[in-house]
Amino acid sequence: LDQLKTAQGIIFVTPIWWNSVPGMLKGFIDKVMKEGDGLTHTVTKTGVRGCLTNLKRAYVFTTSTSPTFWFRTTSGNSIQKIFINKTLKQLGIRKAKWYNFGNISHASKTQRDHYLVTCQKRPLLF
């Protein structure tokens, strides 16, 4: 938790399972990042106010068996709407960028390798 309080940003790398992030990531956020009033958040009359405002930006890299366009348009776009716009904001993280490799179950090794190289070359600004 001390490292989170002094970091400038955070990177999440996770699959999308059943239209959401896995329970293990939710548990990490629940037990580590929100482990008590005043550590990473404050409970107010209007809800949770995030205290990790030092984290200027988050990057979320995901994979999904569904195509990205389908996930964003038909499936409800839950990574953006819930994980980024709600969960991360409740922790105090105001800016986040999401990159998804969709249709991964039909991707070749060459396509997966290309995606990893593309991720490595992305400029991550914190």
Which residues make up each language-model segment?
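Glycine-rich phosphate/pyrophosphate-binding loop and the adjoining helix
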Residues: 70-126
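Helix-loop-strand module that forms the ligand-binding subsite of alpha/beta enzymes
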Residues: 1-81
